[in-house]
A protein has these predicted regions:
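Generic helix-packing signal
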Residues: 17-19, 36, 115
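A solvent-exposed, acidic/Ser-Thr-rich amphipathic alpha-helical stretch
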Residues: 23, 27-76
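Short, low-complexity N-terminal intrinsically disordered segments enriched in polar/charged residues
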Residues: 1-26, 30, 120
């Protein structure tokens, strides 16, 4: 009998909202990749993080920032998940991230993040 490990999107979302970097990181596979596209690292040359050490630095940086995080629009399936993440700094600057995740053996294998923020 084969057992399938399901990705717990609710747990991941809770960790993001609570800025719990350790729990978030524990949900990535050892060879995971995260691709980030935004105004600075545009789609033609996105930022690509490979492996949990590189991903750890990014997650810890985001979790340490003084901002609120709210996960919305969650969708999950057997081997994928997606959500939006709305963030806000105390000065009122907003960030919106759309994320698509590919899951293997219950862990994040690939993640694509597209983010935009207020500019004044």
């Amino acid at each position: 009998m084969t057992t399938t490990t399901v990705f717990d999107l609710d747990r991941f979302a809770r960790a993001a909202e609570e800025r719990d970097a350790s729990t978030q990181l524990s949900m990535y596979g050892p060879e995971a990749t995260v691709t980030i596209a935004d105004r600075i690292t545009q789609p033609g040359s996105p930022r690509v993080l490979t492996g949990t050490e590189e991903i750890k630095g990014w997650i810890e940086d985001v979790a340490a920032r003084d901002m609120t995080h709210s996960v919305t629009h969650r969708v999950s399936g057997d081997s994928s998940a997606a959500f939006t993440l709305a963030c806000r700094y105390p000065n009122g600057t907003n960030i919106l991230c759309a994320t698509v995740i590919e899951v293997e053996d219950g862990a994040i294998a690939k993640q694509i993040v597209v983010q935009a923020w207020d500019e004044s």
